Amino acid sequence: MSEMITVGDAIARTLEQYHVEAIYGVISIHNLPIADAVGQREKIRFVPARGEAGSVTMADAHGRFSGLGVARTSTGAGAGNAVGALVEAMNAGTPLLHLTGQVEKAWLDADTGFIHETRDQLTFLKASSKRAYRISNANQAVAILHKAIQEAQTPPCGPVSVEIPIDIQSAKIPLSLLTAPLKRAPAVEPEASLVDALWAQLKQAKQPLLWLGGGALESGEAVKTLADAGVTVISSTHGRGILADSHRASLRAFHNSPSVEALISQCDFTLVAGSRLRSNETRSWTLELPTPRVQIDIDPAAASRNYLMDNTLVADCRALLAALAERVQGRMWGDARWDSQLKAAVEAAEQGLRDQCGAYAKLNDAIAQALPDDGILVRDITVSGSLWGSRLFRAHGPLMNIHSLAGAIGMGLPMAVGTAIANPQRKVVGLVGDGGLSLNLGELATLAQEKANVTLLIMNDGGYGVMRGIQDKYFGGRQYYNELHTPDFTLLAQAMGLQAWSVDRAEDFQAVMTEALAMPGPSVVEVKMGQIGALRFAGPPQKTLY
């Protein structure tokens, strides 16, 4: 007779097969059978987040680097707390497995008041995930887990939730039900005729524009070949670094700059690779993109979603761009005059941003000088993150400047923790504001406990700075509800056992950041913006909001 193991043990063993390095979660009576199995086997690290939102965000960050993030939450309120972070993982296209509990099978959907019960949990998980499954039969647990992981890792990737009733987690199943991992679905290879047609269009263009999004994160080599040949490249903020900012053909992410928009208008062909052309990067879709326009996307439903396309090629960006790059022969587009115009446009955009940032441009430069070349900037949705953090801070490669794509505040700290655990040999800077940090402040304890290699940079302006800017611009300067009482973050960090610095003069940026970033492990730098000066920002350029 086959050896019997619990479903919790089967889950732990299955995750090991996928080389899962860490599980992020909050321990609960509704996930203890899984937690116990993971703990006994001692092969997967468990990171005890202080809230479910933080745990899923940490797993999201980890999954962006490793190819699979794993989070574990409790039933009901615990699963509900995870929804915002699942929405972010959906926007980022992160391969993520979210394991959560359910009431005992006999009481499912009975509305009896069973502890942690919530009405129709599976429905809100479906709404916030790529897919959501319920395990109703212990013998199907491993099969459903394999299917969920395959779904999460199949482009377009996204979070997949699996709810498991507590009694099924502890139920015994035969060890023989453990099966090998499912292979990832193969990339959609482009048909030769499609490549031929696209190459003909590209070759005919005098000055093509390549717009890169997160779907092209693995296309760096092909993109560089095309850029070397003279294709002008611009990226979404998620696509930063696919082509290094230092490349002569890179417009970086300056799509909202007048000088860059003027240059774009001189192009005569647009190739969009793996980008949704989001509202905040196209002035709410009023930015004129050159025609003809061709789009590469793995998702057929993305065709002409935000801009009318002349053609949409359903294919893997890496495969199709590589096929184009193979046909390149030396420099084929542009010339020295175009290079000069492009350089001038980028320099004008950067100078305009530096002027807007004022003294804080020095902070950007101080971090750039002190952070190792392979260091990673993780930024919350904050004024500093949206200004100098988003576009002024250079990206040398993909996933070196990451953020919340859904635009929700509060994810910077847990995202930095997950990034650091996924990249233990690299230094991470977590750029947050005092307002956003308050939403996940408890994760400061997680940072300390896990000794993550993060320097948390807290831009403290005593409230919601972006709301002040929006109220100034759209509401006649009337200021309501944007002031926040916040702690002395330096003392709070020290109370957590963290090394911490406080900066109230721009002249000290270089010295403090050099010292902080040279120290391994977690630390905190609080920048007191009230003494240095405010940053004014009313959101990205777009049509009138109100």
Give the positions of each predicted feature.
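Phosphate/pyrophosphate-binding active-site segments
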Residues: 2-3, 139, 175-177, 200, ...
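Active-site diphosphate/adenylate-binding microenvironment
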Residues: 8-19, 26-29, 34-41, 341-419, ...
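Glycine-rich phosphate/diphosphate-binding loops that line cofactor/substrate pockets in enzymes
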Residues: 10-20, 61-66, 151-156, 194-209, ...
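Thiamine diphosphate
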Residues: 32-116, 266-269, 274-278, 304-306, 312-314, 318-322, 386-464, ...
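Glycine-rich, anion-gripping cofactor-binding loops and their flanking helix/strand elements
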Residues: 64, 214-294, 394-426, 440-441, ...
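Glycine-rich, acidic loop regions that bind phosphate or pyrophosphate groups
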Residues: 100-143, 237-339
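Conformationally flexible catalytic loops at phosphate/diphosphate-handling active centers
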Residues: 119, 147, 151-204
